[in-house]
Amino acid sequence: MRKFIFITASLILSAFYCSAERYVPTQADVDRFFKTKTYVVLQNNPMSEYNMKVKEAVEKFWTITPFEFINNTQFEEMRKDPEKSFLVVIQVKFPKDKIEASYNFLSVLLGAAVKRITDMPEICGIPISYANVDEFSWAYKSKALVTFLQNHIQLMKTNSELLTANMFNYYNKNRGDVHTKELWVVEKDLAKEARSLATLQSNYKFTIKVVKSEDIEKAIEERNTNVVFLHKVGPEGTRMQARCYKMIIGIGENKLYYWDYHTIKNKEDDGLMIKDLKKLNK
């Protein structure tokens, strides 16, 4: 089983470096979550782009539990209460990986009277960036990520297939449904081999558009159900190069259509690759 190292989203106040087995949620955990109030943990930087975007997302779209916004200090004071849940950015490491990079995950945790954050039950979490990547490269997607997590948790309530360590593999069965949508990608999220429009069109049989991040943010705001977009998590030019996560997320229906990752090495570049496009054709 893989092991994780978690630290809190804010390095200014405190940091927790602990190793723990990955928690697999139970049906009882999911049922308990729906009886909690969810506390959304904001970062300490008052100018944080993430803070602004996640507040907008939660206030507009979060409906499954009552919610309140708190800071990191309050999180430390409240996290042992089992009647509370938390939406929080944590940093994750995979000690068994050859290159031990740190990744930001947007996670939903249950309160528990435990010493370590790693022992708090995690309902689910989605990778959003490498730890040292500027939040402007991903914060614009926050509304889609928050609504996807909400939809995923609702699905967990009735679908036991999602109660697994590899819960997002479940969504790859939706891969064929992407053919009826427009796939929007930002150029920097494509591997170098796939950055020409001719290459994209020759390797992907359906509609694909290279757009700006502002276009994706606008589509998310408008809940454009004709659009799916690439959410890529990679080093973005930073020194640490390890995993590259690739997700195709639907807008409006808040569904995941594709989930995969590869280790960056040799021809395995930072971004969506030609082999991913070919998988999406099927």
Q: Where are the regions that the model predicts?
A:
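Extracytoplasmic/secreted cell-surface and envelope-processing proteins
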Residues: S48-V54, E77-R79, K96-K98, K192-S196, ...
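Start-of-domain marker
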Residues: E21-F105
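Flexible, glycine-rich surface segments
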Residues: T158-M240
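A surface/extracellular/periplasmic glyco- and lipid-processing/surface-interacting theme
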Residues: C124-H179
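Bacterial Sec-dependent N-terminal signal peptides
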Residues: M1-T26
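Amphipathic beta-strand/beta-sheet edge segments enriched in Tyr/Trp
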Residues: I90-T147, I216-K282
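Structural alpha-beta junctions
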Residues: E59-I70, T199-V211, G252-N254
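A compositionally biased, intrinsically disordered/low-complexity signal enriched
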Residues: T38-V41, V108, L183-W184, L200, ...
